[in-house]
């Protein structure tokens, strides 16, 4: 392939896919399937179920398959090609991450975004590329899923996840769960391990402050909700928050023709420095999980307090509009509605709005999710066993699940729900235990490899009797016995009762 010449996209991808197949063959990957089949009441038990087929779920599935664990399924409630936030509620123009990060490539060069991009557009265009366009990243993930032939079941919602007395995990699914679809059916599957690859929402969901509860839903939204921005043309729109999503939603409203957008920020100044970027290294990726608990808390508390800044591009995208207004040191002190008009009070003024968007992040309270109700009371949180220093309070961190080294939940009461050890939390809620390896692009491959290796080890241990029996039964000889004779036997000097090894 000429590194400086654009190829026809289809031809370029075809060549790249051939290279990937060759790379995998040279590495003898995927490994042959090795996990003994298990059935229950005549039903084949899945070795691994992954809930969520976004970037984290796909990467985990790919690594499991490379390790020879192919009796697996991914379930995602989104239609095919719409998994994750990238073309739903993510509203930035480009990714924040630098374009050269290898992301979910699992140390396979031909699986990187760069390889995918250059195969279609050439190296010169890669060099000219500023950052990865958001929609193009989704195109890459669709290709990733296809080229690895990952077993995703779309339009499928998990209605209930519960453990059984035999140690298996039962999932009640609603298939065909597209909004408005009448062609739905329920199905129950059994799994030995379940991975919750549920992204930024983690175990909880969108966080909206209590002050907003009385505002009718048609007048407000969370930044992760579907929003009809075209309907906001000429309207007065407010956005609460200083995150990247706050600016992206403000920009989306402005670009759709909003008459005025007011951005309300609690802080007196926008954060300017992404502190965790300053210590990004393999040491952080592989060392965080081994830190003492007090240091884990200290690192993430400081990161939360300093807060990652919105990307400069996102801020400039909003600031370019004359009808955009930034209000610093402006927490909401009052919020009410008068008919279809919202009245916002801050220490610096009163504002009337037609629509209000809360870019206020997510919470990790597992007991707010109906599908997790059977296991939620048993899940140990950090608050159940760890007390931070008095000057370092943080309720979001305190509600994080207290995971083991395998990303698995731990029991609040030992012995009450032992199957939790096979339910793995591979999403944002894992950050306090494992670091930022279960959802962000920079270290997603490292996290997926850690998870998949842990599951492989657990499956082997659980089937050790079967593997030992296979060890004993194995009888493929490598020597025929006629390669070289015993000199002492030929001389007749070996005692007849000499034991064989």
Give the positions of each predicted feature.
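Conserved N-terminal glycine-rich FAD pyrophosphate-binding loop of Rossmann-like flavoproteins
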Residues: 78-106, 270-287
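Tryptophan-centered motif/residue detector
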Residues: 82-89, 116, 143, 366
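Flavin (primarily FAD) cofactor-binding/catalytic cores of flavoenzymes
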Residues: 2-78, 126-256, 262-501
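A short alpha-helix-loop-beta-strand transition element characteristic
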Residues: 86, 98-100, 106, 124-128, ...
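A conserved beta-strand/loop capping segment in the N-terminal third of enzymes
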Residues: 103-138
């Amino acid at each position: 392939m000429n590194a400086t010449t654009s190829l026809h996209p289809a031809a370029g991808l075809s060549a790249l896919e051939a290279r990937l197949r060759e790379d995998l063959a040279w590495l003898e990957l995927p490994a042959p399937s090795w996990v003994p089949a298990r059935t229950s009441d005549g039903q084949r038990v899945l070795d691994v179920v992954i809930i969520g087929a976004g970037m984290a779920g796909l990467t985990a599935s790919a690594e499991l398959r490379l390790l020879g664990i192919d009796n697996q399924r991914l379930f995602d409630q989104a239609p095919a090609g719409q998994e994750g936030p990238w073309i739903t509620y993510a509203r930035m123009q480009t990714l924040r991450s630098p374009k050269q990060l290898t992301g979910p490539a699992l140390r396979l060069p031909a699986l990187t975004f760069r390889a995918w991009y250059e195969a279609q557009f050439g190296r010169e265009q890669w060099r000219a590329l500023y950052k990865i366009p958001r929609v193009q990243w989704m195109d890459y993930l669709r290709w990733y899923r296809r080229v690895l032939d990952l077993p995703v079941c779309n339009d499928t919602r998990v209605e209930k996840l519960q453990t059984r007395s035999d140690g298996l995990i039962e999932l009640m699914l609603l298939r065909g769960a597209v909004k408005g679809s009448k062609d739905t059916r329920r199905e129950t599957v059994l799994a030995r391990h379940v991975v919750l690859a549920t992204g930024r929402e983690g175990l909880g969901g969108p966080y909206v402050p209590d002050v907003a509860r009385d505002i009718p839903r048609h007048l407000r939204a969370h930044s992760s909700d579907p929003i009809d921005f075209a309907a906001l043309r000429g309207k007065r729109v407010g956005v609460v928050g200083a995150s990247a999503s706050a600016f992206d939603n403000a920009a989306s409203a402005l670009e759709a023709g909003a008459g005025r957008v007011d951005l309300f920020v609690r802080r007196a100044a926008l954060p300017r420095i992404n502190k965790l970027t300053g210590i990004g290294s393999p040491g952080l990726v592989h060392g965080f999980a081994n830190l003492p608990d007090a240091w884990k808390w200290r690192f993430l508390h400081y990161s939360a307090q300093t807060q990652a800044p919105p990307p400069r591009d996102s801020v400039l995208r909003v600031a370019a509009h004359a009808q955009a207004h930034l209000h610093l040191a402006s927490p909401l002190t009052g919020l009410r509605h008068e008919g279809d008009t919202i009245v916002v009070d801050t220490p610096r003024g009163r504002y009337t709005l037609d629509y209000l968007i809360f870019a206020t992040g997510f919470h990790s309270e597992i007991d707010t999710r109906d599908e997790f109700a059977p296991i939620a009371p048993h899940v140990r949180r950090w608050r159940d066993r760890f007390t931070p220093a008095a000057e370092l309070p943080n309720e979001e961190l305190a509600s994080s699940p207290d995971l083991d080294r395998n990303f698995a939940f731990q029991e609040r009461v030992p012995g009450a729900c032992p199957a939790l050890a096979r339910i793995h939390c591979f999403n944002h809620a894992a950050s306090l235990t494992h670091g930022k390896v279960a959802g962000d692009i920079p270290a997603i491959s490292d996290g997926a490899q850690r998870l998949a290796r842990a599951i492989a080890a657990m499956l082997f241990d659980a089937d050790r009797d079967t593997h030992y029996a296979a060890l004993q039964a194995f009888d493929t000889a490598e020597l025929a016995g006629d390669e070289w004779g015993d000199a002492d036997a030929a001389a007749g000097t070996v005692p007849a009762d000499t034991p064989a090894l």
